[in-house]
Swiss-Prot record:
<dbReference type="GO" id="GO:0003677">
    <property type="term" value="F:DNA binding"/>
</dbReference>
<dbReference type="InterPro" id="IPR038476">
    <property type="entry name" value="UvrC_RNase_H_dom_sf"/>
</dbReference>
<keyword id="KW-0267">Excision nuclease</keyword>
<comment type="subunit">
    <text>Interacts with UvrB in an incision complex.</text>
</comment>
<keyword id="KW-0228">DNA excision</keyword>
<keyword id="KW-0227">DNA damage</keyword>
<feature type="domain" description="UVR">
    <location>
        <begin position="196"/>
        <end position="231"/>
    </location>
</feature>
<dbReference type="InterPro" id="IPR004791">
    <property type="entry name" value="UvrC"/>
</dbReference>
<dbReference type="GO" id="GO:0006289">
    <property type="term" value="P:nucleotide-excision repair"/>
</dbReference>
<dbReference type="InterPro" id="IPR010994">
    <property type="entry name" value="RuvA_2-like"/>
</dbReference>
<keyword id="KW-0234">DNA repair</keyword>
<dbReference type="GO" id="GO:0009380">
    <property type="term" value="C:excinuclease repair complex"/>
</dbReference>
<dbReference type="GO" id="GO:0005737">
    <property type="term" value="C:cytoplasm"/>
</dbReference>
<keyword id="KW-0742">SOS response</keyword>
<dbReference type="InterPro" id="IPR036876">
    <property type="entry name" value="UVR_dom_sf"/>
</dbReference>
<dbReference type="InterPro" id="IPR035901">
    <property type="entry name" value="GIY-YIG_endonuc_sf"/>
</dbReference>
<dbReference type="Pfam" id="PF22920">
    <property type="entry name" value="UvrC_RNaseH"/>
</dbReference>
């Protein structure tokens, strides 16, 4: 804890409000709320914490706080601050999960559409549906029953659907608003589960067609009735009152929270949402934050009613969500919340079981790898790869795996400084020397195993530096690829030999992951350096444009193509003198005109 934090802790009030933890760069990394700011914020810097909270605290270099008039105000402010700042330690809803809805547009001639985007005052939305297939099947059925406009053609033109009897836009006068209002009302009734009237109408039409011996039309009506019945049976009835509601349940264990939401529409369970995340405060408080964020996301329509667990304060939920908030006390409704809670518990337990299984497999792979090589269990592995094109922009990269998992904070990049031309062995010698001379002289953690991407030449070069130049004793292995650039074999020992390793073993999969990761990291770095060098070299002859200004341009425009499209004003906004900016702009303009 630094002196700034110590001083600020003394100034905290005994009031409700929000606090914002910041890292050394001033970036907000966590937003929280508290009934008592003094007690809550101080708790981070006192006593022991679990691993995830210790990680958060280790990054806190400063904090701010905002006093509010009540706990409810603090909750609302917290949700807004999280949305605005997106702190890395706060709950993040899955951004890849958007459900399909059926939409009736509010155009003069309404259309039925499937969409994943909800826009206010843009029509009526029904759903969500569990997947695109289900939504499409429902829409197909609606298209056959209700003659909405199906295309964007002008209404004075007859379309294909008109001939199928599935579109009446051409025949109904656009001034007949009552017709379209009635049609929309029928669809709303149908999608809200009140489809008895529709079925009765279809049965009447089927009998009428049959009496007229129009058997094809009668069969069409029969199939529509059958389609409605099928749609009914595919949805599980969870509530007899046919109400639209979302049902929340949550469970906490080992510093993690799982929230399950059942989407119930017209008494039928149509989908569920599952989210798991670490929590840092009281479970009830983080659950409230989750609910606020959940409904702030436009992908989630607010139903008429929301069921919550009995441990949650319904007045706080009502303050952030404009719906009827219910804490069921008995019967079927209480069982629904219990079911959501049970599912949350099962999901969280499955997560822990999978993590434990993965940990056992990885730990076993590391231990077995050590046995195969005749060394101690290689808990920390450092792997190296070189990257260049015909010796240009040569770089190298190091990745670190601890307990079989990447430790990205320990990754390192190297620009090759002493090697001229494409010499992979010399490049490896330079990088190994630079890395482990620092390890030796600065007392950094020594790895249990070094892996180099390459064959005998790379391994011998690395081992020679480690043993003879630095006098260290660290095992060095090599990973060779085949002609398809895939992990092929492991080299180790003195003399070097291929280590027999089954392709379907966990040890092989671990080595494959390590080799892929170091290759990815090296290639990415090489592309960045090459792009930067190419960008810089094209601007070398412009007077007044030195390395710092080139760096400014690269940071702002990212590529030469983007810079060539920039205006003179955009270039000058970076603080580049007018004469230099004009010279650069003239150069770029003349180049683009060639």
């Amino acid at each position: 804890m630094n002196e700034l934090i110590k001083h600020k802790l003394e100034l905290l009030p005994d009031s409700p409000g929000c606090y914002l933890h910041k890292d050394k760069a001033g970036t907000i990394i966590y937003v929280g709320k508290a009934k008592n700011l003094r007690n809550r914020v101080r708790s981070y810097f006192r006593g022991s914490h679990d691993t995830k909270t210790e990680l958060l605290v280790s990054e806190i270099a400063d904090f701010e706080f905002i006093v509010t008039g009540s706990n409810t105000e603090a909750l609302l402010l917290e949700i807004n601050l999280i949305q605005e700042n997106m702190p890395k330690y706060n709950i993040k809803l899955k951004d890849d999960k958007s459900y399909p809805f059926i939409k009736i547009t509010n155009e003069p001639f309404p259309r039925l559409l499937i969409t994943r985007q909800i826009k206010k005052n843009d029509g009526l939305y029904f759903g969500p549906y569990p997947d695109a297939y289900t939504a499409t099947e429902v829409k197909k059925l609606l298209d056959r029953i209700f003659p909405f406009k199906k295309c964007k053609n002008p209404v004075n033109k007859v379309c294909f659907y008109y001939h199928l009897g599935q579109c009446q836009a051409h025949t109904i006068c656009h001034t007949d608003k009552a017709y379209w209002d009635s049609l929309v009302a029928d669809v709303k009734q149908f999608l809200n589960g009140k489809d008895d009237k529709i079925i009765d109408d279809l049965r009447s039409k089927m009998l009428e067609a049959s009496n007229k011996q129009e058997f094809e039309r009668a069969a069409e009506y029969r199939d529509l009735i059958s389609g409605i019945a099928t749609m009914r049976t595919k949805q599980r009835v969870m509530s007899k009152d046919l109400q639209d509601r979302d049902i929340f349940g949550y469970f906490v264990d080992k510093g993690w929270m799982c929230v399950q939401v059942f989407f119930v529409r017209q008494g039928k369970l149509i989908q569920r949402d599952v989210n798991m995340f670490p929590y840092y405060n009281e479970a009830e408080e983080d659950f409230l934050t989750y609910v606020g964020q959940f409904y702030s996301d436009q992908r989630h329509l607010i139903p008429k009613e929301i069921f919550i667990p009995e441990t949650i304060d319904e007045t706080l939920v009502a303050a952030i969500v404009p719906a009827r908030i219910v804490k069921p006390q008995r019967g079927e409704k209480k069982q629904l919340v219990a079911l959501a809670t049970k599912n949350a518990r099962v999901s969280l337990q499955q997560k822990f079981d999978l993590l434990e299984k993965d940990l056992r497999k990885t730990s076993g792979a590391i231990e077995h790898l050590g046995q195969l090589l005749g060394i101690e269990k290689p808990v920390r592995i450092e792997a190296f790869d070189n990257s260049n094109i015909q010796g240009t922009s040569p770089v190298a990269a190091m990745v670190v795996f601890v307990d079989g998992k990447p430790s990205k904070k320990d990754y390192r990049k190297f620009k090759i400084k002493t090697v001229i031309g494409p010499d992979d062995y010399a490049s490896m010698r330079e990088v190994i020397y630079r890395r482990y001379s620092r390890v030796k002289h600065e007392g950094l953690q020594v790895p249990d195993l070094i892996i180099v991407d390459g064959g005998q030449g790379q391994v011998k070069a690395a081992r020679d530096v480690i043993e003879h130049q630095l006098g260290l004793s660290i095992p060095v292995a090599g990973l060779q690829k085949n002609d398809k650039h895939q992990t092929h074999e492991l080299l180790f020992g003195n003399p070097l030999a291929v280590v027999e390793l089954p392709r379907n073993s966990e040890e092989f999969f671990l080595l494959h992951r390590i080799q892929d990761e170091v290759h990815r990291f090296a290639i990415t770095f090489h592309r960045q350096v090459r792009s930067k060098n190419a960008f810089s070299s094209k601007l070398d002859h412009i007077a007044g444009l030195g390395p710092k200004r080139k760096q400014l341009l690269l940071k702002r425009f990212k590529s030469m193509t983007a810079l060539e499209q920039a205006s003179l004003e955009e270039i000058q906004q970076l603080g580049i003198p007018k004469t230099v900016a004009e010279a650069l702009f003239d150069h770029l303009t003349s180049k683009s005109e060639v």
